[in-house]
Amino acid sequence: FEPAAKEENIRLSDKQQKLAVRMAGQLTEIVNQYIDASAISFSIIAWPLPSIGDRFEAIMDETIKVNNLDNDLFRSIQQKMIDAIDGAEYMHITGMNGNRTDLKVALWQLQDPAKETVFENCCADVNIPVGEIFTSPVLAGTNGTLHVSSVYLNGLNYRNLSLRFEDGCVAEADCSNYEDREENQKYLRQNLLQNHETLPMGEFAIGTNTTAYAMARKFDITQLMPILIMEKTGPHFAIGDTCYSHSEDHKVYNTDGKEIVARENEKSRLRDTDPEQAYFNVHTDITIPYDEISAITACFADGRQVDIIREGKFCLEGTEALNEPLNI
């Protein structure tokens, strides 16, 4: 869906925008006051509806396949990626085929590599389907441009979406939905930034579900895919809160026994002293398709570089099996 810019469209005033942001924050605080997030869990899965069209049965068959991929296989492959990245200073992501992404994502520095890790190895235990690895970026030092030629977020299309980050926060946002740049800015402010002046990068992830990516391309349903699946179909970046929002003090571990220590950033660190500045009550995943990725590279302090993806394909030794569905 791509709304037309009309004078008759209902828009919040500046005062109302500030009230909406404040209300969302207070509502979240009330929920967390009565629900202990560390004491509960969930599992979520997505299926197509018959309204998807006359190929419903074929799409359902493919979705069943996607939702039942080998959990142990993906855990093993993703662990190889995490082991290769741990200890890096930052990730460097660049685009190709018209994608202008050139972004450095600063990573948490490990104090005890034998017991700690930066990325969570996310399989199909909570979010189904498998799989991704994700982390909470360090905001300071996270700089550059994130660009996607076309992406659907919360049902809305963004054409040529471009976000420029300075120290992990959105410093400039643009898109080409409308001829009038002012209308583009309003569209982004109201829908993407959700009335915030800026948002931090709360998550950097590498989605590994190439089978889901191939399904979306095969049936030309990328615009219809729920974010639960789409976030697994390529590297993605979430603007807003981290994945550990309001649960930063609850220790979590990968199956290898290492504690995932990158659970907070410079914003959420203010949760005890200035909670209104710590949380944004927004978490929007922006996925770059594999065919627009030139490289995702782990960069180390000693100058060493390790490619995870090169020219749209997984290239780290031990991850090659992920490329099989990409031969479409």
Feature roles, as predicted:
Residues F1-G141, I308-I328:
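Active-site bordering "gate/hinge" segments
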Residues E2-E8, S51-G53, R100-L103, D112-P113, ...:
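Flexible loop/turn segments at secondary-structure boundaries
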Residues N97-N99, F165-C169, F300-D302:
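Short acidic-glycine loop/turn motifs at beta-strand connectors
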Residues G141-N143, Y158-N160, D167-V170, L199-E203, ...:
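Active-site lining segments that contact anionic ligands and/or coordinate catalytic metals
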Residues E172-E248, N281:
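Dual-mode signal for accessory low-complexity, basic/Gly-rich regions
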Residues D256-I328:
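Extended hydrophobic packing segments that form well-structured cores
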